[in-house]
Amino acid sequence: MRKLAVLTSGGDSPGMNAAVRAAVRRAHFHEVQMFGVYHGYEGLMRGDIKEMSLGSVGDIIQRGGTILYSARSEAFKTEAGQQRAVEQLRAHEIEGLIVIGGDGSFRGAQKLTEKGFPTIGVPGTIDNDIPCTDFTIGFDTALNTVVEAIDKIRDTATSHERTYIIEVMGRDAGDLALWAGLAAGAESIMIPEASQDMDDIIERLHAGQRRGKKHSIIIVAEGVGSAASYAEAITKETGWETRVTVLGHIQRGGSPTAMDRMLASRMGAAAVDLLLEGKQDRMVGVQNNQIVDVDFQEALAKKHQLDLSIYQLARTLSI
């Protein structure tokens, strides 16, 4: 292969730029041309493709977001859209494509492989919800952003003796809520993977109050429902002043942590190596701190498994 391309798709995550940088520089190391596809699959169908030099990825390792931009595309989900994407790649004489994104992005990459075009996936999402990899690019940065926010909210919760409910992202996965809750010492954590009824939460709050605790932090993953509804229920049952903070898209932004920069660099370079080895229809991952690659079909068929031992630990430490 003499020409490769890279695109970012779906929700942005801190570290995507580091992965793009690694892919471009690894390709140049192997004397292979690298092209950037701008605006995800939507841009791919339009032919928004430009060659990337070593200088084009200078000073981006520390930047959040993605210099290639990202967009969701309904048109790409169609047979005609996918065929148009392949035609654009071949028109530019590109022989392999690296897709950085989440499970939806990988399904798109798999469609291209089915049409005879080699693709490799790199997991980039703050949700950490991709099977077959311990971590995804952006999770560590988002985790640190959430913990920092919780620490600040706890200051005001303590000052006003209030209960605060903080809603974090994650779609149907509770990793971000769970890890942040443990790291920030939350009194209760609500995630999709572990049922916890309101009576249990209120009893734990009452138990803390009996020990002299005058404020509480509850972390709610967006996949379990609205934080506002839980706040209303707690106020109704206890009469306590309860506030809600929805952290929102602040969790996606910011300069990536050293951990995310390292992970993205390793994964981006590995994706290039896999294509040059003649591999395709695979996803790069990290397991036990070792870079691995797994079949797309295997990764997409499995369900992400949250480590419930962390949840049990958080419950025992929040008494």
Curated annotation (Swiss-Prot):
Record has Magnesium as a keyword: yes
Record PROSITE patterns: PHOSPHOFRUCTOKINASE
Cellular component terms (Gene Ontology): 6-phosphofructokinase complex
SUPFAM superfamilies: Phosphofructokinase
Active site (record annotation): D127
Presence of keyword Heme: no
Keywords of this entry: Allosteric enzyme, ATP-binding, Cytoplasm, Glycolysis, Kinase, Magnesium, Metal-binding, Nucleotide-binding, Transferase
Complexes and interactors: Homotetramer.
Family designation: Belongs to the phosphofructokinase type A (PFKA) family. ATP-dependent PFK group I subfamily. Prokaryotic clade 'B1' sub-subfamily.
Name of protein: ATP-dependent 6-phosphofructokinase
